[in-house]
UniProtKB/Swiss-Prot annotation:
An example molecular function term from Gene Ontology annotations: structural constituent of ribosome
NCBIfam families noted in UniProt: PRK04306.1 (NF003303)
Keywords: Ribonucleoprotein, Ribosomal protein
Family listed: Belongs to the eukaryotic ribosomal protein eL21 family.
Lineage: Archaea, Thermoproteota, Thermoprotei, Thermoproteales, Thermoproteaceae
Protein name: Large ribosomal subunit protein eL21
Cited HAMAP family: Ribosomal_eL21 (MF_00369)
GO cellular component, one term: ribonucleoprotein complex
The keyword Cytoplasm appears for this protein: no
Gene behind the chain: rpl21e
Species of origin: Pyrobaculum arsenaticum (strain DSM 13514 / JCM 11321 / PZ6)
Domain of life: Archaea
GO terms of biological process kind: translation
Amino acid sequence: MVKRTHGYRYKSRKLLSKKPRERGVPGLSRLLYEYKPGDKVVIDVDPTFVSTAPHRRYQGKVGVVIGTRGRAYVIETYIGDKKKIIVTTPEHLKPFQGGS
C-alpha cells in the first residue's frame, strides 16, 4: 500500500468552493478597500485567487493589520496561544464588523 499525500488544500473541498451565484471575481469595493495598521480584519479565503490565499486553517480568523508588503497586507492573528503572521492580498480580507 502507498501512503496518500496530504497537499496544501487537503480537506478543503467545501471550504474553498463557491456557490453558483458567487462565482467569478468579487466586486471592486472589496478589492480596492484600503486597510490601515491597527484595523481588525476577518480572513475570508477567496478560492478565485489561489496563489495569494492563506492556508485554510486561517479561514474566519480575526486578525490585526500590522503593515503592508507591496500590495499585500501583513496580518497578525492567533492560533490558540501562538501568534501567527499572515501575508495576503485584500481579496482574502474583510473588515471586522463586530464589537471592540
